[in-house]
């Protein structure tokens, strides 16, 4: 069989199982109201939790950064590509998100995927046992695999099982890895207990706060700040293309950890540094997130979350008990989930259908992502659409 034939057969199998993914093309900036594939829609698909992606101040900051630093970085961070914008952002991030450890330092990455791979592969290896939550993000899973550590998966948020696994381990180095907010369920990891176990067993606790940074905690400083945790065992990873509205990611930890990443993290060392203008814009975003406007946006978002929770409970399907901006509604079968998403789309509502392998088989769902850019009228539209579909399904 020709190589292309093998791929064609594989794609047919994906189609037969209702699992083909398709990209959609946005013709306008990321916002609550967009033009996608030439049609006006209300979007419930993005991770723009604070509605900052099209904020005029950030657009201006991107332009200012490009004028000041140019279109590209020109090299890796260690070979000419580390600009003043990158350095300033790392200082800003350490101050904003590093309150959980003394002598905090931050390291800026081009993507959250790279930050997760870099951290796990630099800190874990042969002789390390890595304890990973069963529902961790794909980038954490891949980082664990690439680290060559012994990887043990503990049941989702089950700290009793994790405790037993730690007790049974004689590894030289132990690393606990977890999302803070789980991206497909919206629930929050038991961070205080995870840190307690990490300190009890002399382990690192690495948390991916991709969906918590900017939204949770005082001034949006993240899930660790919300839980009021402090420890040199903690390492926090956050993304800057979600609530922050721009792009990139960062790791915050004790300065010694960050210096180790600079020296040993291959995804940091062997890649061109991100566009300096983006770093300049993220610094502007942090000022919004941590200020009065950020507080107001989070308060509005919380109102939307509470209303959506009540709305989903009134449907014939299974809502996940999420108190975050990620509001899943489990439908079950792939085809049924796709049909509901398509019906909502025809009504001008973009609510993505999430299917295996992203979520377990039999738990295909609508993933409703809320943003401070949404209005109550937007939720009126969503509620009406779900009510009509629910009446047909009942």
Swiss-Prot record:
Pathway: Cofactor biosynthesis; biotin biosynthesis. SUPFAM superfamilies: PLP-dependent transferases. It comes from the Bacteria. One of its GO terms (molecular function) is 8-amino-7-oxononanoate synthase activity. The modification N6-(pyridoxal phosphate)lysine is found at residue 242. GO terms for biological process: biotin biosynthetic process. Keywords: Biotin biosynthesis, Pyridoxal phosphate, Transferase. It catalyses: 6-carboxyhexanoyl-[ACP] + L-alanine + H(+) = (8S)-8-amino-7-oxononanoate + holo-[ACP] + CO2. Substrate binds at residues 21, 137, 358. Homodimer. Belongs to the class-II pyridoxal-phosphate-dependent aminotransferase family. BioF subfamily. This is 8-amino-7-oxononanoate synthase. It comes from Paraburkholderia phytofirmans (strain DSM 17436 / LMG 22146 / PsJN) (Burkholderia phytofirmans). The lineage of its organism: Bacteria, Pseudomonadati, Pseudomonadota, Betaproteobacteria, Burkholderiales. The gene is bioF.
């Amino acid at each position: 069989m020709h190589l292309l034939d093998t791929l064609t057969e594989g794609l047919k199998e994906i189609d037969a199982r209702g699992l083909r993914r398709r990209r959609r093309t946005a013709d306008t900036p990321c916002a609550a109201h967009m033009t996608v594939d030439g049609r006006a829609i209300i979007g419930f698909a993005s991770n723009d939790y604070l509605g900052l992606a099209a904020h005029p101040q950030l657009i201006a900051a991107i332009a200012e950064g490009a004028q000041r630093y140019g279109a590209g970085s020109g090299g890796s961070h260690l070979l000419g590509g580390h600009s003043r914008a990158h350095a300033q952002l790392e200082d800003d991030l350490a101050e904003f998100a590093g309150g959980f450890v003394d002598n905090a330092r931050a390291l800026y990455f081009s993507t959250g995927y790279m930050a997760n791979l870099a951290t796990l592969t630099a800190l874990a290896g042969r002789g390390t046992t890595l304890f990973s939550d069963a529902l961790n993000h794909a980038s954490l899973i891949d980082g664990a695999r690439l680290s060559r550590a012994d990887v043990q998966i503990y049941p989702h948020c089950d700290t009793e099982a994790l405790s037993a696994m730690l007790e049974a381990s004689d590894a030289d180095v132990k690393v606990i890895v977890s999302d803070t907010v789980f991206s497909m369920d919206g629930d929050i990891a038991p961070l205080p207990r995870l840190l307690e176990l990490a300190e009890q067993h002399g382990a690192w606790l690495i948390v991916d706060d991709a969906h918590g940074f900017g939204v949770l905690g005082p001034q949006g400083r993240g899930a660790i700040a919300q839980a009021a945790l402090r420890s040199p065992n903690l390492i926090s990873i956050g993304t800057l293309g979600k609530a922050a509205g721009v792009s990139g990611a960062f790791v915050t930890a004790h300065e010694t950890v960050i210096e180790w990443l600079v020296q040993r993290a291959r995804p940091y060392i062997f890649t061109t540094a991100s566009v300096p203008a983006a770093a300049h814009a993220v610094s502007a975003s942090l000022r919004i997130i941590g200020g009065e406007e950020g507080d107001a946006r989070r308060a509005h978002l919380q109102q939307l979350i509470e209303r959506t929770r009540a709305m989903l409970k009134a449907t014939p399907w299974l809502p996940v008990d999420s108190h975050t901006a990620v509001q899943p509604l489990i439908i079950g079968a792939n085809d049924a989930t796709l049909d509901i998403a398509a019906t909502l789309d025809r009504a001008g509502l973009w609510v993505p259908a999430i299917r295996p392998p992203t979520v377990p088989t039999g738990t295909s769902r609508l993933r409703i992502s809320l943003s401070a850019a949404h209005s109550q009228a937007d939720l009126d539209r969503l509620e009406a659409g779900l009510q009509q579909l629910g009446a047909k399904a009942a």
